[in-house]
Amino acid sequence: MAMEFKYVRIQGKEIALNTLQGKGIFSMCWQMVQDDRMEQEDADLFKEIDSWFAEHLPWPPQCKNQEPVVCWFKTENSEEMLKMIRTAMWLLEKYKHPYYVIYTNDPGEIVYEDQYQVATKVDGYLQIESLQDGWFGKS
């Protein structure tokens, strides 16, 4: 049985201060560019990718204002977007920068939506719990 999901997000291990969620792929790549961790040719490639997205993907006002939101691509309408983002994922892999591809049908409370993406509100709360006893071999 194939699983189908409505939304996808690429994020890293780094936690964004304003959301307490993993930084998104654009944040991760820009940080690598700013920290000179990419060769110039690769930095230029990412800048081209980012420019393409700036031209083709609306920028949610909540993101412009650095509000605590997380953006997700819509899987059904974003084939071209996801094709373009694969090159940025390749750059992360080339520089051994870990990332996760997360799929969901429930990204949270949607505060912005366009043809290609949604932005969801985050509450700024990160819940950390102990493992349940069963994970320690106890019954």
Q: What does each model-identified segment do?
A:
Residues 90, 94-139:
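Acidic, proline/glycine-rich low-complexity IDRs
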Residues 58-111:
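Short glycine-rich, low-complexity/disordered patches
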Residues 1-77:
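Long, contiguous N-terminal structural blocks used for assembly/anchoring
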Residues 5-7, 22, 82, 115, ...:
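Low-complexity, intrinsically disordered short peptide segments enriched in small/polar/basic residues
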